[in-house]
Amino acid sequence: MARYLGPKLKLSRREGTDLFLKSGVRAIDTKCKIEQPPGQHGARKPRLSDYGVQLREKQKVRRMYGVLERQFRNYYKEAARLKGNTGANLLQLLEGRLDNVVYRMGFGATRSESRQLVSHKAIMVNGRVVNIASYQVSPNDVVSIREKAKKQSRVKASLELAEQREKPTWLEVDAAKMEGVFKRMPERTDLSADINEHLIVELYSK
């Protein structure tokens, strides 16, 4: 499945919630009628079956993290293989992606922009350039901006935006040095309560 390149607001309206795909700190429901699906006049939402609800939740989370269908299924398989709660494991694997960590640290305004920084070799992990967005960051890893990329206006603008967001407790960021430490894996309570990962587990368990 190809990566979606269309309007970001349309995806959030499709899922009925802000997927944080835009760079602004203002919630997008102040800009558009997020409760209405995309399309002329916003088509009325059909009543979903249990399967439909599970599928929508999976699509919502997959789009939020910018992961393709095959990748997402592989993350689920890995989460099911690990000890502990499968749903929580899945979210930790997604949160541990390098592009997501770059976003959480405030170096990129969105996960999409953070993915670009990674692919353009602007990001280092423990002093070495890593250009794979899906690279799994481990506790105590140091993630930083390459020296020649520190002058990029988009990085500086992203750090300014990040000052207005709630700072993740599992990260430690030095904005002046443009580097941060992935202190630990986030607990479930650290992450959005708007995600119902048990629905995804139910979907894939069938």
Curated annotation (Swiss-Prot):
Gene Ontology cellular component list:
small ribosomal subunit
Under InterPro entries, the record lists: Ribosomal_uS4, Ribosomal_uS4_bac-type, Ribosomal_uS4_CS, Ribosomal_uS4_N, S4_RNA-bd, S4_RNA-bd_sf
Print the keywords alphabetically: Ribonucleoprotein, Ribosomal protein, RNA-binding, rRNA-binding
**Domain of life of the native organism:** Bacteria
As given in the record, the signal peptide range reads none
Q: Which cysteines are joined by disulfide bonds?
A: none
Q: Where is the S4 RNA-binding domain?
A: 96-156
Under the GO molecular function aspect, what terms does this record hold?
rRNA binding; structural constituent of ribosome
Q: Which GO terms describe its biological process?
A: ribosomal small subunit biogenesis; translation
Family membership noted in the UniProt record: Belongs to the universal ribosomal protein uS4 family.
Q: How does it assemble?
A: Part of the 30S ribosomal subunit. Contacts protein S5. The interaction surface between S4 and S5 is involved in control of translational fidelity.
Q: Main role?
A: One of the primary rRNA binding proteins, it binds directly to 16S rRNA where it nucleates assembly of the body of the 30S subunit.
> Which NCBIfam families does the UniProt record give?
PRK05327.1 (NF003717), rpsD_bact (TIGR01017)
**Descriptive protein name:** Small ribosomal subunit protein uS4
